[in-house]
Amino acid sequence: MDIQTILEKTLPGLGYELVDFELTAQGTLRVFIDKEGGITVEDCATVSNHLSRVFMVEDIDYKNLEISSPGLDRPLKKAADFVRFAGQNAKIKTRLPIDGQKNFIGKIEGCENDTVTVSFDGKTVQIELGNIDKARLRPEFKF
């Protein structure tokens, strides 16, 4: 099995969502997890201990394993992410331009039929999930 398959099969059973992962050229495997209510240090330790054992059994080659929350500016990858974070601001970069524009910063209005609706500058744009290159939440800080 590959790393993604192992993570997708293992993490939900532990009560966590796989947000993203990366394997660096130096051999560091970073796994970003989330759950309702957020991630604690204990959650990271639990997942790290469990995955270390699973990766040993599956003979996955890595040097260091890092488990982390996705942070306030978490990536948005799946339709469920855009549904969950409707009403929040995001920065979205598309693969192909929409009306001559590839970068959008605005409020996520929702996601239906694999199409994300975003409002910005008094306009609304619909972006197909397949056209999204990168998307991240843009947290607002009010002082």
Curated annotation (Swiss-Prot):
It is found in: Cytoplasm. SUPFAM superfamilies: YhbC-like, C-terminal domain, YhbC-like, N-terminal domain. GO terms for biological process: ribosomal small subunit assembly; translation. CDD domains: YlxS_C. PANTHER family: RIBOSOME MATURATION FACTOR RIMP. Belongs to the RimP family. This is Ribosome maturation factor RimP. It comes from Neisseria meningitidis serogroup C / serotype 2a (strain ATCC 700532 / DSM 15464 / FAM18). The lineage of its organism: Bacteria, Pseudomonadati, Pseudomonadota, Betaproteobacteria, Neisseriales.
